[in-house]
Design a protein with these regions (language model features):
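Hydrophobic micro-packing sites on short alpha-helices
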Residues: 44-49, 59-60
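Short, Lys/Arg-enriched, disordered terminal segments
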Residues: 1-3, 64
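Short basic helix-loop element that most often maps to the first helix and adjoining turn
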Residues: 3-22
Length: 64
């Protein structure tokens, strides 16, 4: 589950629908990414990061 992405989205006061519209994907895609059911392309990751004001490491790096 991508809690980091969800928290960053909530910190920007964006709904899944709003974020999806800004980056040009469906709300379902955002939901699947946040739930860990979809691995986005690097391009999509970069677009999400731009909108949320985060780096790829901030949102998608997993500490093991």
């Amino acid at each position: 589950m991508n809690e980091k992405m969800k928290q960053a989205r909530l910190d920007k006061n964006l709904s899944q629908t709003e974020l999806a519209k800004i980056i040009g994907v469906s709300r379902q895609t955002i939901n699947m990414i946040e739930n860990g059911d979809y691995n986005p392309t690097i391009g999509l990751c970069r677009n999400i990061c731009k909108v949320l004001g985060c780096t790829l490491n901030d949102l998608f790096w997993e500490d093991k």
